[in-house]
Amino acid sequence: MAKKILTAAPLIDALLLQNLVVGDAKSLRAHESYSGERFAVSDVGGQDLSGASFSECEFVEMEANETNFRAATFVETHFGRLTAPIFIAPRSNFRDVSIEGSRLGSAEFYESTWKSVRFSHCRIGYLNLRGAHLRDVLFDDCVIDELDLGAATANRVSFTNTQVDTLDLTRSVLTNVDLRSLEVRHLTGVEHLKGATINSHQLAELAPFLANHLGIVLNE
């Protein structure tokens, strides 16, 4: 009997933030470091916060349209009800981060590094993770129009009760990526599914894509 292969789940610790001091979002500056602050009901739209570093911080009801978070670092940080039609954070670093109840239009995270990151109850238009390095990431109860994982490296990434209209896996490298609770309508890069776990229903839905890739003619 063949040995059953188990899919490793993301390792995500609970985020506990205590004794935070009230921070002033308008005073945030690029390449500065911030720790133990809570920023509530703030609008940082259009600000340059590139290279900034945040540790043990919380952002609640923040408007961040076209805010430049390029190469910023977030460690043990929580985002609640974040809103941004355009969210700019390429080459950023997220570690032990929770993003909850947020709405993002175009979210640019390409070439970023994520470790122990949880998205829950979020609505995202285009999530660009091309060339990103993802480890221990969970998407829970999210709706994503387009998820671009082209050339990304993903290990222990899971989706629960999540819908993605278009998923691009072109040249991605997957390990322990659990897609069983993910509803996908369109898939690009089916040849790069190695390392993903799917269920029998999903396999049947993928049959036309697999047949096309392998040059198999389906004819009843």
Model-predicted regions and their roles:
Residues 2-220:
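Tandem repeat scaffolds
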